[in-house]
């Protein structure tokens, strides 16, 4: 399954790639953002992704843009080191497309989705020390409930944590299918919001496993450090926690020589939502360095 980048037209319009410029695609994934940027101008893109699986998509895209595309398998928090490793000090723009890709969700062995039972993994980086199995089988009940509430917004977080603890006392929880069943037993289905009861808890576990909010904060800080005057940072987020981090960081940057490109987040059009339902929750925020 190929990942469809959300708000792609809006991102490229706001970024406005120029010939001779240098950009960072901080979430390469399937290469959707990188491809459009490279098609728009005779520029160079330095791509970053912590998932080694993306090398396949990078190799394919590199054939179309030899000498203009580079990849580093790394994290947001290492963005500055990555840029310097390519012999560059400052760049003209950095783009982030947050969350999981369609390829990650479609691969049951990665454990990101409960649609098909698979390993309790959820690691964006295969060398990371903690995974979803560690969370559900070792984390204490109170900490588990707090994570599920804070990162997933799950109002029944304590019931979910209790159900997981009770289940793991009987036997180790080994796959996403079993975990989803346990969660569903603790969360009543809503008639108003008919999403799967496991959705919020799976999101919370994924954020915990990958330290996502801290990585995002660090990524935004380092992106600001490597930006030229006139350069831009663009972030597409998919849930309120991500958007809050972006909004607060951008607000603080406005006191440090930056200016918001759009005062309000840009949302996908009705047509995009129709063609790509995943885009429904997407929000694009953009900021430029002016001094």
Swiss-Prot record:
The keyword Cell membrane does not apply. It is an enzyme of class 2 (transferase). GO terms for biological process: rRNA base methylation. It holds the Pfam family Methyltransf_5. Belongs to the methyltransferase superfamily. RsmH family. It comes from Anaplasma marginale (strain St. Maries). This is Ribosomal RNA small subunit methyltransferase H. Specifically methylates the N4 position of cytidine in position 1402 (C1402) of 16S rRNA. InterPro entries: RsmH, SAM-dep_MeTrfase_MraW_recog, SAM-dependent_MTases_sf. GO terms for molecular function: rRNA (cytosine-N4-)-methyltransferase activity. Keywords: Cytoplasm, Methyltransferase, rRNA processing, S-adenosyl-L-methionine, Transferase.
């Amino acid at each position: 399954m190929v990942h469809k980048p959300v708000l792609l037209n809006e991102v490229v319009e706001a970024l406005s790639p120029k010939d001779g410029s240098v950009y960072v695609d901080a979430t390469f994934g399937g290469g959707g953002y990188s491809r459009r940027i490279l098609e728009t101008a005779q520029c160079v893109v330095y791509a970053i992704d912590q998932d080694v699986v993306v090398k396949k998509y990078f190799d394919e895209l590199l054939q179309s843009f030899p000498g203009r595309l580079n990849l580093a398998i790394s994290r947001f928090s290492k963005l500055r080191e990555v840029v310097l490793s390519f012999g560059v000090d400052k760049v003209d723009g950095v783009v982030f497309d947050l969350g999981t890709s369609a390829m990650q969700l479609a691969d049951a062995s990665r454990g990101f989705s409960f649609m098909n039972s698979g390993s309790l993994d959820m690691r964006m980086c295969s060398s990371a020390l903690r995974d979803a199995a560690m969370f559900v089988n070792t984390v204490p009940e109170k900490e588990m409930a707090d994570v599920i509430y804070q990162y997933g917004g799950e109002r029944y977080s304590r019931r979910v944590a209790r159900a997981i603890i009770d289940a793991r006392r009987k036997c180790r929880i080994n796959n996403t299918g079993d975990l989803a069943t346990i969660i569903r037993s603790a969360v009543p289905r809503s008639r108003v919001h008919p999403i799967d009861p496991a959705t919020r808890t799976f999101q919370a576990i994924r954020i915990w496993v990958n330290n996502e909010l801290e990585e995002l904060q660090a990524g935004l800080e380092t992106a600001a450090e490597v930006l030229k005057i006139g350069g831009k940072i663009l972030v597409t987020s998919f849930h309120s926690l991500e958007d809050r981090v972006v909004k607060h960081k951008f607000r603080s940057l406005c006191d440090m020589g930056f200016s918001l490109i759009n005062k309000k987040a840009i949302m996908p059009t009705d047509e995009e939502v129709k063609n790509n339902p995943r885009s429904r929750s997407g929000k694009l925020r953009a900021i430029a360095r002016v001094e």
